[in-house]
């Protein structure tokens, strides 16, 4: 095998040593306390947490009507901005105080604030509650990813990250569909107490099955100020800047596309129930996240990310060219989502690798960049005059992301 193709020469592939005499199915130990039960609990909880973000997309119209004004800022932007900012807080905090207690605090606050959203009498009140929701919700995903990256046996980590990535993506469809059905049959306010109850159950499950690895069960040797300083140094590395430029676009484009497609289909006379089915069309390809790890073993995580961004750009271009054809629009959205399904676990893994051993900080930066982009998605969609214009704009953004992830690989080689 030539040097340029040796896996150990690539900075974007992590190689975990297999513990001697132990298999991937061994019982949990103080070093690797996570088992399949902990993974399953975190995957389901991730679905519920991210549902709070994506459920805003189909509820903009009913909440705007019910509270007499545009709900875009109160429902979407307030949540997304605090969700993004919260990542920068929770990641270093979990590096210092431990994953389990950080997740417990975040999920407890999220459960209460979610239920309280049902009582919001006005858009400003809803915006304040959604901001609290976003800040508390951001304490789950980066901490859970960091936990799985250190508390699972090394040979099981890629599969767990793939499952979490699938959950993040499925939430994009599940949240929209669940919110649409609740709004249609019960009213938009009922969505919040329903989710509050489910989150309370999830919190109990996480407390029951999640146990910190021995090395992260308490305050770390580094001060909390030191953890934040390391996060700042990480963010300024040239390779990470290129990685972040690509990552910024990932959910920005996803949210913008699904926000825009709803209005586009409504303008063509589609019934809400039909739009729900169209939103569901791309659900099966989201499970491609589960095979991203296998592709990365053969190629690398950076090449898997490039493949994902390339496929998603082609799918989005197809949506632009076939915007007036329902079949073409659905086909393009499926191709686009397939690319996203490959890119998400690849990007998460790349952030985990460049940030080791401070993976909480790495996942914090990953989430912050990702959801800053998400907060811009609805604004981008509502500012475009037509869906075709929106899709063409999003295609160009994805092309820039593809170039950035290509630049990341070159810069990562220099950083070594």
Where are these regions (language model features)?
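C-terminal transmembrane helical hairpin of 12-TM major facilitator-type secondary transporters
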Residues: 303-347
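Conserved MFS/SLC helix-loop-helix module at the cytosolic interface between two early adjacent transmembrane helices
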Residues: 85-121
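Juxtamembrane intracellular "pre-TM" segments in multi-pass secondary transporters
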Residues: 26-32, 211-244
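Helix-loop-helix hairpin linking two adjacent transmembrane segments in secondary transporters
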Residues: 154-155, 162-208
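Helix-to-loop junctions at the C-terminal end of transmembrane segments
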Residues: 87-98, 288-301, 385
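Helix-breaking motifs and short loop linkers at transmembrane-helix boundaries and internal kinks
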Residues: 98, 119-125, 153, 322-324
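Cytoplasmic helix-loop-helix junction between adjacent transmembrane helices
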Residues: 129-169
């Amino acid at each position: 095998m030539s040097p340029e193709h040796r896996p150990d020469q690539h900075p974007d592939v992590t190689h975990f040593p297999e513990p001697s005499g132990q298999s991937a199915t061994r019982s949990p130990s103080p070093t690797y306390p996570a088992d399949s039960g902990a993974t399953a609990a975190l995957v389901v909880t991730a679905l519920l947490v991210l549902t709070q973000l994506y459920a805003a997309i189909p509820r903009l119209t009913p909440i705007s009507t019910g509270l007499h004004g545009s709900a875009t800022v109160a429902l979407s932007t307030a949540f997304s901005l605090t969700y993004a900012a919260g990542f920068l807080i929770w990641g270093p905090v979990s590096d210092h105080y431990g994953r389990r207690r950080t997740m417990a605090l975040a999920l407890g606050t999220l459960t209460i604030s979610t239920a309280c959203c049902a009582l919001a009498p006005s858009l400003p009140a809803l915006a304040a509650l959604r901001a609290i929701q976003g800040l508390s919700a951001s304490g789950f995903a980066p901490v859970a990813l960091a936990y799985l990256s250190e508390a699972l046996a090394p040979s099981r980590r890629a599969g767990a990250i793939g499952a979490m990535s699938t959950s993040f993506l499925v939430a994009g469809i599940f949240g929209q569909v669940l919110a649409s059905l609740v709004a249609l049959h019960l009213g938009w306010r009922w969505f919040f107490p329903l989710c509050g109850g489910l989150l309370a159950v999830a919190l109990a499950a996480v407390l029951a099955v999640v146990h910190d690895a021995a090395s992260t069960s308490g305050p770390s040797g580094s001060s909390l100020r030191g953890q934040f300083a390391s996060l700042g140094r990480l963010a300024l590395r040239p390779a990470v800047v290129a990685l972040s430029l690509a990552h910024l676009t990932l959910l920005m484009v996803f949210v913008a596309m699904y926000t825009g497609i709803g209005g586009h289909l409504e303008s063509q006379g589609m019934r809400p129930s039909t739009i729900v089915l169209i939103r569901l069309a791309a659900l099966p390809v989201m499970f491609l996240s589960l095979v991203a790890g296998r592709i990365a073993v053969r190629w690398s995580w950076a090449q898997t990310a490039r493949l994902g961004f390339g496929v998603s750009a082609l799918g989005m271009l197809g949506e632009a060219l076939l915007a007036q054809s329902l079949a073409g629009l659905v086909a393009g959205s499926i191709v686009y989502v397939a690319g996203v399904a490959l890119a998400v676990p690849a990007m998460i893994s790349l952030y985990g690798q460049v940030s080791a051993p401070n993976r909480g900080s790495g996942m914090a930066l990953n989430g912050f960049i990702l959801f800053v982009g998400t907060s811009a998605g609805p604004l981008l969609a509502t500012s475009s005059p037509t869906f075709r214009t929106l899709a063409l704009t999003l295609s160009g953004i994805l092309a820039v992301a593809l170039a950035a992830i290509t630049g990341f690989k070159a810069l990562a080689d220099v950083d070594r």
